[in-house]
Amino acid sequence: MNLEKLRARKGFICDMDGVIYLGSQLLPGVREFVSWLNENDKQFLFLTNSSERSPKELQQKLQRMGLDIGEEHFYTSALATAAFLKKQAPGCTAFVIGAPGLLNALYDVGVTMNDVDPDYVIVGETASYNYEVITKAVRLVLNGARLIATNSDLTGPTEFGIAPACRSLVAPVELATGRKAYFMGKPNPLMMRTGLHLLGVHSEEAAMVGDRMDTDVIAGMESGLATVLVLSGCTSRTDVNGYPYRPTYILNGVGEIVTG
């Protein structure tokens, strides 16, 4: 496989889980890939559908793994959700099922927490998900709150195996209310447009690197980027055959961008 055209791209948008790390384990070839990005003056952005951590926390997580990357290189679905609400409904209220990364992003744009009569019910990943909060969310949506989810990932990779992700968590609320959530993360074009804007490059000059066909690859393809599927996360080569579209490149991991 000739990777010269890929290496010539000016900008790289990379997913994190299953691409850069699995849980707390850095994946093989990542150090070399990040060094290559820096040495070749590439513009790069880690664009994650996870809403649990802030850019600062993601920076610190990679720092603990031995990678020193500036906070400006991270953008999350929590930030995308906050930016959407700031533009669509400034000063709105919300009942939030989510981790501090989501809550803080919403606070920062002036969203007020409200568990009585909120404008929105917002669902992200959290370890505190339980029957009580599902029931509360269902009742609020039935009473008129609009339903938003930070991303459409059904599952996500961890060092222990596959874990349920945001779409799995919001599904009971959708089923119980008959309302469909609006999903903010990849492949939502708003997320990709923001990523390209932060990179400062045009779509034809950039590549999207991810481990999911249904979010990363389709997001890149529909936004006009070259797409790189890495098999280090939750997608196998066989899985690709189940989709009507194909990535531009299929690699075992990001290290092959440098060495392949």
Model-derived features: where do they sit?
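Asp-based, Mg2+/Mn2+-dependent phosphohydrolase catalytic module
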Residues: N2-K42, R53-Y75, A82-G260
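Conserved phosphate/oxyanion-binding catalytic-loop motifs
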Residues: S50
